[in-house]
């Protein structure tokens, strides 16, 4: 629709006091934001001229040269109040489009109201002469733009007006001619086989039992390819020795499918068991640590206060996203246990208390003589956990006892983090 300025709608011309002293347009052309700004000496300009003037390097009133800033302009409330009281025609008195650049009054169909400028916004929202689009759908091409008070007349010819179907009461556009023929579930139709009349919603249930409908033998899967009307089904099934051969074919096919299903089930069961084992082992770690040149390490790491921090350590390893290693004191961790081998498990990161189950085993060439110990404990304060007196040195280091083989000592270890399940609680 054409945009109208207030100056286009004035009933009477206004005095110069309501015009901008620079461009001579009205001080405000918009009805939704009427604001008259003035310089400190009372000179009034429209908002566009004030903006241009302040964007100029001089930033001054064009009349009195007073320095101004947009945010510091004062409002002329008297002029604003007087301006709002002036009379204008409703913009819907005019035709929607200009002709030759001019607005044209619609003497026959336009709004005849004369209102104050301050009433324009409220009036425009409620004016029955306002232009609207057809509310029945964007597809409407016949007079799809009209005045609000012409809606009832428009609906008489609008093919997109939705009216309740006389059978199912569903709102349907008048142009939808196919509704009764293909959609309406409450419309009566005839079965194409037996010609019985029924509601469309009843047809699918009827077709399951219609005696005139042509069907295939229910033993088609077994090889019978005959088609017949449903009412002849009993006679057909009695033929071919009661279809015993076809029934046997179906049984054989089902047996083959059953065997294949059984094989598939066994494969899935095997995969399930494999995955279950992997899940069980995901919280376990086992390995062995081979310490070469063992007897020399026994000599190089004596038990005394000076060397008590010396040890043999295995390479770092990762388990459950944490870094660990194992350390061995060939002659004990402290003088009090100098006759024993000390073994410890270490966690190399700051971590809350972790409950851990682990075992060490010093391997003997005779598996029945291997020395194995288990423990369930917590890591605390970054200290290792293990045994100060794991095994007597003389037992391990005596040649011929089977622990040191080829000057190598082998220590197996296994780590497990027990899974804890919080109890279910209802408050």
UniProtKB/Swiss-Prot annotation:
Recorded superkingdom = Eukaryota
Q: Does the keyword field hold Manganese?
A: no
SUPFAM superfamilies membership: RING/U-box, TRAF domain-like
Q: Where are the zinc fingers (TRAF-type)?
A: 122-178, 178-234
Query: According to its UniProt record, what is one Pfam family this protein matches?
Result: MATH_2
Positions of the MATH domain: 284-415
Q: Where in the cell is it found?
A: Cytoplasm
UniProtKB keywords: Cytoplasm, Metal-binding, Repeat, Zinc, Zinc-finger
A single Gene Ontology MF term assigned here is:
zinc ion binding
> Would the keyword Repeat turn up in this protein's UniProt record?
yes
Question: Zinc finger, RING-type: residue spans?
Answer: 20-65
**Which residues pair up as cystines?**
none
Cellular component GO terms, alphabetical: cytoplasm; nucleus
What the entry lists under InterPro entries is as follows: MATH/TRAF_dom (IPR002083), TRAF-like (IPR008974), Znf_RING (IPR001841), Znf_RING/FYVE/PHD (IPR013083), Znf_TRAF (IPR001293)
What broad class describes the main subcellular location of this protein?
A: cytoplasm
Membership in a protein family: Belongs to the TNF receptor-associated factor family. A subfamily.
Q: What does this protein do?
A: Probable adapter protein and signal transducer that links members of the tumor necrosis factor receptor family to different signaling pathways by association with the receptor cytoplasmic domain and kinases.
User: What does the domain comment read?
Assistant: The MATH/TRAF domain binds to receptor cytoplasmic domains.
- Indicate what this protein is called per its UniProt record: TNF receptor-associated factor family protein DDB_G0285149
């Amino acid at each position: 629709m054409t945009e109208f300025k207030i100056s286009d709608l004035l009933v009477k011309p206004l005095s110069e006091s309501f015009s901008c002293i620079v461009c001579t347009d009205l001080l405000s052309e918009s009805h939704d934001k009427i604001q008259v700004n003035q310089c400190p000496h009372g000179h009034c300009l429209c908002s566009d001229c004030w903006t241009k003037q302040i964007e100029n390097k001089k930033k001054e009133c064009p009349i009195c040269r007073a320095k101004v800033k947009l945010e510091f302009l004062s409002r002329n409330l008297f002029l604003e109040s007087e301006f709002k009281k002036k009379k204008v025609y409703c913009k819907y008195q005019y035709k929607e489009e200009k002709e030759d650049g001019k607005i044209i009054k619609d003497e026959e169909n336009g709004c005849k109201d004369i209102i104050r400028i301050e009433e324009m916004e409220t009036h425009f929202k409620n004016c029955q002469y306002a232009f609207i689009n057809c509310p029945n759908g964007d597809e409407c091409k016949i007079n799809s733009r009209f005045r609000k008070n012409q809606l009832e007349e428009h609906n008489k010819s609008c093919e997109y007006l939705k009216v309740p179907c006389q059978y199912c009461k569903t709102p349907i556009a008048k142009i939808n001619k196919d509704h009764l023929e293909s959609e309406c579930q409450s419309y009566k139709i005839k079965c194409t086989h037996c010609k019985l009349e029924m509601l469309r919603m009843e047809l699918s249930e009827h077709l399951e039992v219609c005696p005139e409908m042509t069907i295939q033998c229910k033993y088609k899967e077994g090889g019978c390819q005959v088609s017949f009307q449903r009412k002849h089904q009993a006679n057909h099934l009695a033929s071919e020795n009661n279809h015993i051969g076809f029934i046997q074919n179906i049984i054989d096919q089902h047996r083959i499918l059953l065997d294949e299903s059984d094989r598939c089930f066994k494969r899935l069961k095997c995969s399930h068991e494999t995955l279950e084992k992997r899940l069980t082992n995901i919280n376990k770690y086992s390995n062995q640590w081979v310490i070469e040149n063992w007897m020399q390490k026994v000599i190089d790491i004596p038990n005394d206060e000076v060397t008590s921090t010396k040890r043999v350590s295995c390479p770092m390893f990762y388990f459950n996203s944490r870094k660990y290693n194992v350390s061995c004191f060939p002659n004990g961790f402290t003088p009090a246990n100098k006759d024993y081998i000390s073994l410890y498990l270490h966690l190399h990161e700051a971590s809350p208390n972790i409950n851990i189950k682990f075992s060490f085993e010093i391997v003997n060439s005779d598996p029945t003589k291997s020395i194995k110990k288990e423990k369930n404990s917590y890591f605390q304060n970054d200290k290792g956990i293990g045994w100060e007196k794991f095994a007597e040195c003389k037992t391990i280091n005596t040649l011929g006892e089977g622990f040191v083989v080829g000057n190598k000592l082998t220590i197996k270890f296994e780590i497990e983090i027990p899974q804890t399940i919080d109890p279910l609680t209802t408050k």
